[in-house]
């Protein structure tokens, strides 16, 4: 069952806004529904593009976002998903459409260099308040493809 707040996340791609900020309790399902909506939006609007999936660390991002997404039955039914752990890239295909979701960790002030120079069509930043400002600003700046959108989740610290 989808809650009214989760329905708003699913509707975000069709809004006039360029950014979504989700705030909610831990284990409320916001990250899972955001990732589903993020990938669905990317696959419906782009092909051959790169997207950022950002967490505090690459490992936490992999465990909390990538692995649950690849295990999601709806995702497995709709897409061909290939997770290349060594490259930190999840390749998602459906028909002639292929997009790449690159995982980044924003754990310290030097982390911005990991995303610097990339061109992204969108980014999802999970638990963004735990990331240094320099990393967040660099991720936002990298979203320079026309039509790019930002997806951010907050936690209370």
Name each region found by the language model.
Residues 1-155:
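Phosphate/NTP-binding elements of NTP-utilizing enzymes
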């Amino acid at each position: 069952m989808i809650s009214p707040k989760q329905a708003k996340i699913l509707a975000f791609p069709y809004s006039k806004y360029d950014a979504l900020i989700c705030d909610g309790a831990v284990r409320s399902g916001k990250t899972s529904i955001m990732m589903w909506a993020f990938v669905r939006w990317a696959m419906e609007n782009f092909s051959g593009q790169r997207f950022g999936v950002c967490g505090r660390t690459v490992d936490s991002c992999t465990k909390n976002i990538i692995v649950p997404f690849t295990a999601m039955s709806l995702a497995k039914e709709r897409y061909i998903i290939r997770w290349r752990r060594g490259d930190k890239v999840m390749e998602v295909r459906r028909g002639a459409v292929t997009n790449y979701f690159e995982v980044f960790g924003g754990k310290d002030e030097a982390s911005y260099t990991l995303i610097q120079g990339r061109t992204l069509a969108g980014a999802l930043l999970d638990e963004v308040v735990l990331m240094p400002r320099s990393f967040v600003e660099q991720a936002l700046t990298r979203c320079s493809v026309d039509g790019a959108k930002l997806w951010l989740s907050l936690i209370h610290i």
